[in-house]
Amino acid sequence: MTNQTIQEALGHGQGNDLGNSDGHRIEYVETIEAYNKWAEVYDTDGNFLQALDTFEMKDLLPRFLCLVQTQTNGKSNMTPGEQVLKLVDLGCGTGRNTLQLAKSAPKEAQIIGLDASPGMLEVAEGNLKAQGVMGTVDERRVVLGVYDLLSPRPESLPVSLRGEARASGAISTLVLEHIPLDKFFEGAARLIRPGGYLLVTNMHAEMGAISQAGFVDVTSGKKIRPTSYAHEVGNVIAAAERAGFEIVPLNGAEKVRERRVNEEMVALLGSRARKWVNVVVWFGLS
């Protein structure tokens, strides 16, 4: 296992990389800074991997919620803190899947969106309020908070996640790319109570060998890239197990779901997916 970044693996500084055929100069910045800048256009810049993730989560999220509810309903002698079903969106970004959790989870569940980027959280709050799932009579149903997996501070967590009052389950979509594996799973384990579930999706290492997350800053014209890692699926599973997680089949048999782009997917995801035909770009596991 390696913590070498994609920038280091590609062997360049501020030049062009193999996945950047649009002619923009590349600028590497700290991840939080990058996402604070990206927040303004994150939902509208045509990110095909985000679109693929949204499509896959339509199937994965109900399966995840079924696992969490079955485990919670079957547990006896729960403490008062455990009696409230808490679900975390770890690295919630602009609230894309926080919204889906709020819509799909039982009404008594509390949804907690955490992200290291204040800029992304600001957009998330606006999106969730616009959809009527924040700022309602029950202000505790959906809450957001700043939480940096690279420098976790328990006091920064919402009160409902502090101490022993941990979550029944968490999702983390397209976040792992930016965090060393052990740090990610150790941080996730702090948020989830024993027996809870974690659903993770991420950019596949086959895509990471070519390029990484990033966006074009309309002001400077530069391609802004955060710190990213091309995590191999086997290394991800090993790190999860070191942190005390056990991989659970997503549908009774499929432990890891991987997606390779084909022409049919291009029609679904848009023209930006075309250059990734025949490349495995995404995976998910729980």
UniProtKB/Swiss-Prot annotation:
- Domain of life according to the entry: Eukaryota
Q: What class of enzyme is it?
A: transferase
The reply on keyword Endoplasmic reticulum is: no
**Reported induction:** Down-regulated when grown with elevated levels of potassium chloride.
| Signal peptide per UniProt | none
Q: Does the keyword Magnesium apply?
A: no
InterPro entries xrefs: Methyltransf_11 (IPR013216), SAM-dependent_MTases_sf (IPR029063)
Q: State which Enzyme Commission number(s) the record gives.
A: 2.1.1.-
Question: What are the GO MF terms of this UniProt record?
Answer: methyltransferase activity; S-adenosylmethionine-dependent methyltransferase activity
Q: Read off the SUPFAM superfamilies from this record.
A: S-adenosyl-L-methionine-dependent methyltransferases (SSF53335)
List residues traversing the bilayer.
none
- Report the Gene3D superfamilies cross-referenced here: Vaccinia Virus protein VP39
**A GO biological-process term:** methylation
Pfam families per the record? Methyltransf_11
Instruction: Print the keywords alphabetically.
Output: Methyltransferase, Stress response, Transferase
| Described function | Involved in osmoadaptation.
Name the family the entry cites. Answer: Belongs to the methyltransferase superfamily.
Q: What is this protein called?
A: Uncharacterized methyltransferase AN0656
Q: Which source organism does the UniProt entry give?
A: Emericella nidulans (strain FGSC A4 / ATCC 38163 / CBS 112.46 / NRRL 194 / M139) (Aspergillus nidulans)
